C-alpha cells in the first residue's frame, strides 16, 4: 500500500554529483517500550519529523493549530457563487527536481510521484518588454550559466565586459556555512551591484528569484541569494524546471500523508495549538494545550518564525538565555497577497501555466491553474472559463490592501490583455505574513536543529542545517534532521538524506572561486 522506508534513502535525480548525508547508525527501530515524542506543527517540517519517528517505532503525537495538515501549503474548501465547492490555498509552489528529501517524503505515499505534473518552461517577463526562458538552457553547470548568458536578451557583449569577475567567481564554489560568513553582511541587491550584473538581468531573472523568499532583495541576505544560485543554477545539474501538484494540495499531498501517519499510529491532533512547554526536572517535558497538559520524552518544534517566537516567549524555562534571545530576534517577511480569480472565459491558449514577472507594479507572478491543476481544469471545462492566480510579495505592511489587489488585477490586464474583457465570476484574496525573513546579518540568530536541551529539536525553513537547501526542501530536510538527532540519542538508525553538491562541481571551478578570496 505504501512505499517502505529502509532509512538508506535514494537520490531519484539525474545529478551524479548529488551529495549523500549518511544516517546516524543504530538498530532498525524500537521494539517494546518506545519514547513518546510531540511534534508541534503540521507543515512539511513537522510531517517529515513525525513520519521518520513513527517509522522507527516512536510514539508520536502531531499537534497542528489549523484544521488540516500542510502548514503554508495547506488548503481549505470554499463555495463559489455558482454553488461549486473548490479548494483555496496560499497558491502556487514549485517542486524543483533538487528537492530530494521533500520528494523522498512524498514517495512514502506516491512512489512514482504521479501526483506531480511537469511544467515545460519557467518563463520570465519584464514590463519593459524583455522576456526570458529556462526551457532551452542546458542543465549541467557551467554550461547552464553559459547557455543562459548566450540565450538571454538581458546579456550583451558590453554587459559581459563590465562584469566584475573577482566578485562573480565566488558563486562557482558555494559552501554552507562558509557562504554566510562571506556574504551574510550585505544585501542581495548590493551583491549583484558588486558583481555588476546587467541591470536588465538584475531586475528580470535575479529579482524574480530573490522575491521567491518573500522579501525585497534590498533587505535579503546576499548569502541566501548565492545559495539559491548554487542550488538551482550553478551547483546542480537538475535544472530550473519544476513540477507542480496535479490536484489541490490536500488531495494530492496531505490527505495521503495524514493517512500514512495514522497507519503508523501517529496521534494527529488538528485544531490544537500548543500554549506552553515546561521541561521536567527529572527529564521529559510537559506540553500544555487549551484543555490538557501531557508529558513527553522529547519534542520537535516545527513552527513558523512567529509561532516559534510566541511559544518560546510563553515557555520561560525552555532553552537557555542566548537561545531564547536569538529566537526572539527572528523576523517575519513582509505581507504577501495571493489572488485567485475565476473568469468567464479562457486566457489565450499559448499562455504558460506559470509566469514570473518583474516591472509590473506589485505583481510577481501569474499562474493559469487550469493548465495543470485538475480541479481548476474541470471547472474551466464546465464553464468555458479559466482560473488565474496572482502573487504579490513583500508588500509594505501599511499598504492599502484593496488598492494592491486592484493594481495586481490591472497588471494582469497588461500581461495578458485578453483578460481585460473577461468577467470576474468570483475571487478570493489571501493576505498572509508568516514566512521567515532572511535579513542581512540575520544568519547568526537562526536556530539550529539542536537546541540547548538535547530532548528538544527545531525544524522549519528558517533553521540552519549546514546543508545547501532552501525553501520547502529546507523544511523537509530539517524535519528529518530533527528526527535523526533524537533517534541518534536513542541508538536507532536515522534517515539518509541527499543534497545538491556541497561545493563547486569541479576542481577547476573551485580554483576559480578561490580567486575571490
Curated annotation (Swiss-Prot):
Catalytic activity: a carotenoid beta-end derivative + 2 A = a carotenoid phi-end derivative + 2 AH2
Pfam families reported in the protein's UniProt record: Amino_oxidase
Membrane found in the keyword field: no
InterPro entries, A to Z: Amino_oxidase, FAD/NAD-bd_sf, Zeta_carotene_desat/Oxidored
Signal sequence segment: none
EC number: 1.3.99.39
Residue ranges, annotated region (Disordered): 1-24
GO terms (BP aspect): carotenoid biosynthetic process
Cofactor(s) required, per the database record: FAD
Gene3D superfamilies for the chain: FAD/NAD(P)-binding domain
UniProt entry tagged with the keyword Hydrolase: no
Family the entry assigns: Belongs to the carotenoid/retinoid oxidoreductase family.
Its job: Involved in the biosynthesis of isorenieratene, a carotenoid with aromatic end groups. Catalyzes the introduction of two additional double bonds into each ionone ring of beta-carotene to produce isorenieratene. The reaction includes an intramolecular methyl transfer from position C1 to position C2 of the ring.
This protein's name: Carotenoid phi-ring synthase
Species name: Streptomyces griseus
Annotated gene: crtU
